[in-house]
Amino acid sequence: MDYSVSFENVQNSLNSLSSQMKELEQRREALIKETREVISLCSKAIILLHGDKVKDAEALLNSASSSIKKLKDYVICDLDRYLWPAEQEYVEACVLKEIVERKSFLSGHDELNVSLNAYVTGLLDCTGEIKRMIYDNLRKNNHGYSLSLFEIMQSIYNLVYPFSFYDNLIPGIRKKLDVSKRMMEDVRITMTEEYQRTMFLNEFTSISERR
């Protein structure tokens, strides 16, 4: 007995899949293109913050925030991972701004309206900018403030460290923690040397004055 099969339902399903894939690809390309602009805005804001140009940096971060909100409309299925790099850079810049402004509290992911994954990795990236602030302040002999910044850097690392076990769920977190740890060691060595140098100079000055 002859046997034939209708592939109408199969074809309909594949047509739906094709339409879905085309839409996903269009959204993915839009996300990749637009997130580059957000990352650029945040990078420029970070440079301005290190130059104490907080208002100018704030304007760029406001633009970045607006762009991120619009980009969330492109996110369907698992495309949110293409938004993470932009959110991560945004978190890094915003937290740095709050530290530069000496705010009493640092924003959480809800306040910044970003994903938790991007928030935690952005925090770790910010430790690199804090390191730069520490070195800048050491050169200005702002030792007390440098120590405060180091404590902030260390606190961020200690708070995030327990999540190193979720490296398979938060891509790159373990590597970022390793980088952050090395930076803290570098800063600790530099600050110890600077402290010893200062103590020596103070002692030398004291001896010279007694003569």
Residue ranges and their predicted role:
Residues H143-R211:
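Long amphipathic all-alpha helical oligomerization modules
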Residues E98-E101, F105-Y157:
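Long, charge-patterned amphipathic alpha-helical coiled-coil/hairpin "stalk" segments used as oligomerization
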Residues S6, E23-E34, L49, K53-D56, ...:
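Non-transmembrane, amphipathic alpha-helical segments
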